[in-house]
Amino acid sequence: MPLKDALLSDVCISTSAAPTYLPAHFFQTKDEATGKTRDFNLIDGGVSANNPTLLTINQITRKMIVDKQDLFTGGPTDYDKFLVISLGTGSAKNAAMYTAKDAAGWGILSWLHSKEGYTPIVDMFSYSSAALVDYNVSILFQALHSEKNYLRIQDDSLKGTAATVDVATKENMEELVRIGEGMLAKTVSRVDMETGKPVPVPEEGTNADALTRFAKKLSDERKARMTSSQGKPSSAL
């Protein structure tokens, strides 16, 4: 569909245009064959899906149902055949930035921008949106005994400049790379169904170990598909 064939640069700028931080983005696509154009006026995709994991799973499931493709031996809702890696962009959730006593005296401006430089209402909506999806997806996979097929890597302990979304200095970029690389050495964690908080799962090793296992599964699946005489996949998507 030519009118949906947007430049990747426009897509990236649009989905990063967080309200109050960065400006909304406009671009236009054109169907050269018909001359028709389509205008896009967009802001950060996180406004509707700050954690797009569940949306992605739904889209894949929908595609399998619509296309009637037999990519699952047990049907499109057989989650044992899904491998999901969810990479968070970090948050400052663990930092005690606000208290009910403080918020009780806030007016409109304080909710939008605190004296410490944070945006309380935006931070709260963003975190709750992402955390709820992580909780729901994690519980879904656990309930279906496929918890090892879902890997969430997220740092909720960001502080200072690293916790901002609009500081693109060389120093901050290098710090974020350091934090990201450090996450590989951390123990795999999974949401506790009672508390809703992530807890370490030592027996599954580090995030790097889990990624290696995922990579092997995908590699084995690709080899199986390529050698299948019928051209049908055997397991994971």
Q: What does each of the following model-derived ranges do?
A:
Residues 1-237:
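Conserved catalytic cores and adjacent C-terminal regulatory segments
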